[in-house]
Amino acid sequence: MASKLPSVLAATEEEIQLLLAAQCHIGTKNCDKQMEPYVWKRRADGIHILNIGKTWEKLVLAARVIAAVENPNDVCVISARPYGHRAVLKYAANTGAQAIAGRFTPGSFTNYITRSFKEPRLIIVTDPRVDHQAIREASYVNIPVIALCDTDAPLKFVDVAIPTNNKTRHSIGLIWWLLAREVLRLRGTIPRTSDGWNVMVDMFFYRDPEEVEKQQQEEAAAKLAAQQGVETEAPAGLSEWDVSSALDWAADPAPGTTTDWSAEPAAAAGGGWGADTGTAGWD
């Protein structure tokens, strides 16, 4: 089936390779009835494979919807899934949107008394199943919803579904990166060239805080070692240690230094233990 997009918006070979490398086409064993049009086939092990062509078509459609919002701050990006926290924050920093990374506070769209109250014109969620609270509240106040949907995702109250794998860090980060780049292109902020945007896709990938801390410690230790010129070799003085001066524990003991423990004890200077100790004058 030929793409319905104009040639200028069609996916390039490099973009298709990125989607395949990030495993955006890998679905789940379960498949929602409304997600069947986006499924290409089902593997022998039961995993559904998504159609990458339709993924790109819906991604461009979502970008055109986002670019139609005059004020970028009226777009709210949401991710309760940890793998999407860094992606939505980077997307918001590059496009000017609002970001909610982590738990969505109930009432953020409906209860104007709360401190986290927002009135966006459009919301984008990472997973309809995890971000169900935000989608439900958006339906109460007529806010359109764009969602990254896997094969098992419910499409209730979702207006634009981007079929993709929303379970792994690389697929989530890549889709958010492609979406941000396409939005900036449609707004005219960056040119439509391969090197028009200098933000790497790695910046959108989730990173484990423990791995980041360990990497920072290793870099700091390496920098300190380079500054101080620490030598990894052992000091030369240790190799010249005179072994002959050490005690020879295997040699015979020196004469006169042993004691015969089986011999009778020597008599005390004042006599035996039973001798009079001269206590007569105590009283």
From Swiss-Prot:
Location, primary (coarse class): cytoplasm
Lineage top rank: taxon: Eukaryota
Keyword Nucleotide-binding: no
Gene3D superfamilies (alphabetical): Glucose-6-phosphate isomerase like protein, domain 1
Alphabetical list of PROSITE patterns matching this protein: RIBOSOMAL_S2_2
InterPro entries: Ribosomal_uS2, Ribosomal_uS2_CS, Ribosomal_uS2_euk, Ribosomal_uS2_euk/arc, Ribosomal_uS2_flav_dom_sf
NCBIfam families for this protein: uS2_euk_arch (TIGR01012)
Function description: Required for the assembly and/or stability of the 40S ribosomal subunit. Required for the processing of the 20S rRNA-precursor to mature 18S rRNA in a late step of the maturation of 40S ribosomal subunits.
UniProt protein name: Small ribosomal subunit protein uS2
Source species taxonomy: Eukaryota, Fungi, Dikarya, Basidiomycota, Agaricomycotina
